[in-house]
From Swiss-Prot:
Family that this chain belongs to: Belongs to the AAE transporter (TC 2.A.81) family.
Protein name (Swiss-Prot/TrEMBL): Uncharacterized transporter PPA2034
Entry superkingdom: Bacteria
GO terms, molecular function: monoatomic cation transmembrane transporter activity
Subcellular location: Cell membrane
Natural source organism: Cutibacterium acnes (strain DSM 16379 / KPA171202) (Propionibacterium acnes)
Xref: Pfam families: Asp-Al_Ex, TrkA_C
GO CC annotation: plasma membrane
Keywords: Cell membrane, Membrane, Repeat, Transmembrane, Transmembrane helix, Transport
Amino acid sequence: MTVLTDFLATHQLLTILIVLASGALLGQIKFGPLRFGAAGALFMGLVVGALDPRFGQNLGMIKGLGVVLFCYTVGLAAGSTFLSDLKRQWGLMLAGVVGLAVMAAAGLGLGRLFGLTPAHVAGLYAGVLTSPAIDAASMATHGAADTLVGYALSYPVGVVVGLIMVAIIAKRCWPASKDNTSMAEAGLTAVSTVVDRETSIRQTPGFNDDQVRMSYLLRDGEMRLATPDDDLHVGDQVLVVGNPDDVNRAVEHLGHVSERTLTNERNELDFRRFVVSNPALVGRTLGSIDVRGRTSGKVTRVRRGDLDMLARSDIVLQPGDRVLCVVPAHRLSDAADLFGDSEARVSQVDALSLGLGAALGLLLGALMVALPRGLQFELGTAAGPLVMGMILGSIHRTGPLRWQLPHATNAILRQLGLMIFLACVGLASGPAFLSQAVSGTGLAVIAVSAVTLVLGGAIVIAAAWCMKLSAQRATGAFAGFVGQPAILSYANSLVNDERIESAYGALFALGTVVKILLVQVIVLV
């Protein structure tokens, strides 16, 4: 055994990869309704790290790379919808601040009851909320061992309790009249419709505000592309595309559902999915691209990952998007030339924008701000890249630089970064977890961590319910409140809903700022 541990201690990269592989295997095993997913790397890291303290030494740079990759890519994904959702989420953000303050107060009170030191409480607060506030806590306590013990014991508690709470609420359905409908949940449908009245396309409910699109128009036996300026006459047939509720309203206005399926007739008009790989289109809205002038066609849908969206004029194209374009049959090649339609091209990572964006995030995170009473504040290697990613994700491009990554590339980098980070945390925390987990102090830390997290999380979830926001947005808000990447990953594996990442991004950045401040207050009280 000594020979093996000596070998692994001198080959840390091999050790990390073993933890990643075994953690991925553990993450696929179901424990009732719960599956650890990426968090399996954390628990395997704890097991392996407990074998020899040397496994967890000098992992700061590798761990930092993992957290930067994860947080920056999450920021890019959340940034595209964050600004539009800000008005809807300000209440959740306020609830998150209240929840963090209540957790700090409860931690101090329960800590004194169980005989824990302020250093213990500062460590467990940073650990159960899985935040970079541990750096601030260590500085405030001058590197006290109690701080690191509290962090090591409470970190896994934050993961387990967080996963359980997400499993409980992620698939719930409660009244959410103040939330927008999930694009993934609503889905899209296309209905061939017979026109029973004299009207026009612009008069159709939902057309002017981009809730429905029309493509095929059959008149007097001739098929052509419908345009916004077309008048519709009795006997015409049109294809209406949108989510089911909007399509039903449009069909009721126009006439009735046709027995004929217009999309089956592809002699004059045809349709195909094209991959967006043309750099000139990335970061631009659909409305700013002259699709009709260059192809005599029209885009009706945009598929991003597993999400199929109606082609609204304000949708910003990202590399790897798959647009469904209806064009005259002889102009399919023109549409392919316009969008690029190259899988190989979008599979390449734009190292310039990725490296520059992440570097800007690290610079932002390194800015130190001095506060009264000797307090210091910096975003750190997690919140800095996240905030920068959200900023760059919202502006999409700067001159020739395209900040967004293809959806598949973003997902791969995010998952890789997350598992590297969790594996390193597990390896570094293993010895302390093994030595203290079953002691009186260790059990007290675990109990206080679990109780305070449930209390703080309940405040955020209750706030979402009171504000009539969806359970899925509440799930993302809770994951961002905790700040645990594995919880976000688990939530996304349960529900395909873009509101989860939007809420996560909103609370993660703000929560990190508040945690860094409160953890220093805990030490001073």
